[in-house]
């Protein structure tokens, strides 16, 4: 489907969970001849990341209201109005055929600006619980899609766009069948790390001994303290890294993953075809719990919520999974994934632009 001469503006910011799926769709459409620009904020990750992908970015000033003081709340309407006016001026100059909202605060004023100019608004909700911005924008959107069932009652479930190198991994049967030796446990805390996993997993390693080998991604600034915790637990042989640059290689290495359940992590683990032990971040709307639930229901994962998390709970769970069980879970994870999510979102963008 050629997009020669078509223009898209992607609105996404704040976290990798919003930005990476947006980049996947942007690259897919650019390969079809689309021009793509980005709307973001100058102080969040998209400011550095998006230009590295060869995409020009425009900035508006907007931030969240949750947990802010009374002064910020009083000033909010004026700030939102100014952000809307700025976004509108950017879109008037760029003249996109369609805008794609992938979440983050920037989508709010951006979506309203597009709607006020008669530009179709396409939304994608990455999480199992809809964010506040997308809840509002859904009322004016041309098309609403969701990664997991339940965020919106009637929206099409299309999955989360994930990185092509993860999608290209061999299927679980090819990758995991015939593996022997210690079970390879990949611990992923995200870019900030997960303190609870950093504290718990060295003790789990001590309980499980030689039956596991661990690759632990500790997050920024925590590598030394986590290495020390493994050493103090008598388990200095395990690998600790601050970041993992090549997640596809890490997934290919792993037999099982212990991690948080951010939307993109859950979708990548399903696409890779890996069993998981999810420890959702404690958030008042339990967003990460709802992200992980479809994989638990599919028999591909187990959820341990943070109040129930203990060294014994993790150690007993991992010890209870034989290699045969892990392979079955991996196959169920892969079967639950939506590998063509990027294409599905891109097709809806194309459709909205032609309508």
Swiss-Prot record:
CDD domains: GT28_MurG (cd03785). It is a peripheral membrane protein. It is an enzyme of class 2 (transferase). It catalyses: di-trans,octa-cis-undecaprenyl diphospho-N-acetyl-alpha-D-muramoyl-L-alanyl-D-glutamyl-meso-2,6-diaminopimeloyl-D-alanyl-D-alanine + UDP-N-acetyl-alpha-D-glucosamine = di-trans,octa-cis-undecaprenyl diphospho-[N-acetyl-alpha-D-glucosaminyl-(1->4)]-N-acetyl-alpha-D-muramoyl-L-alanyl-D-glutamyl-meso-2,6-diaminopimeloyl-D-alanyl-D-alanine + UDP + H(+). GO terms for cellular component: plasma membrane. Disulfide bonds: none annotated. UDP-N-acetyl-alpha-D-glucosamine binds at residues 15-17, 127, 163, 191, 244, 263-268, 288. Its EC number is 2.4.1.227. Pathway: Cell wall biogenesis; peptidoglycan biosynthesis. It is found in: Cell inner membrane. GO terms for molecular function: UDP-N-acetyl-D-glucosamine:N-acetylmuramoyl-L-alanyl-D-glutamyl-meso-2,6-diaminopimelyl-D-alanyl-D-alanine-diphosphoundecaprenol 4-beta-N-acetylglucosaminlytransferase activity; undecaprenyldiphospho-muramoylpentapeptide beta-N-acetylglucosaminyltransferase activity. It holds the Pfam family Glyco_tran_28_C. It comes from the Bacteria. The keyword Glycosyltransferase applies. InterPro entries: GlcNAc_MurG (IPR006009), Glyco_trans_28_C (IPR007235), GlycoTrans_28_N (IPR004276). HAMAP family: MurG. NCBIfam families: murG (TIGR01133). Cell wall formation. Catalyzes the transfer of a GlcNAc subunit on undecaprenyl-pyrophosphoryl-MurNAc-pentapeptide (lipid intermediate I) to form undecaprenyl-pyrophosphoryl-MurNAc-(pentapeptide)GlcNAc (lipid intermediate II). This is UDP-N-acetylglucosamine--N-acetylmuramyl-(pentapeptide) pyrophosphoryl-undecaprenol N-acetylglucosamine transferase.
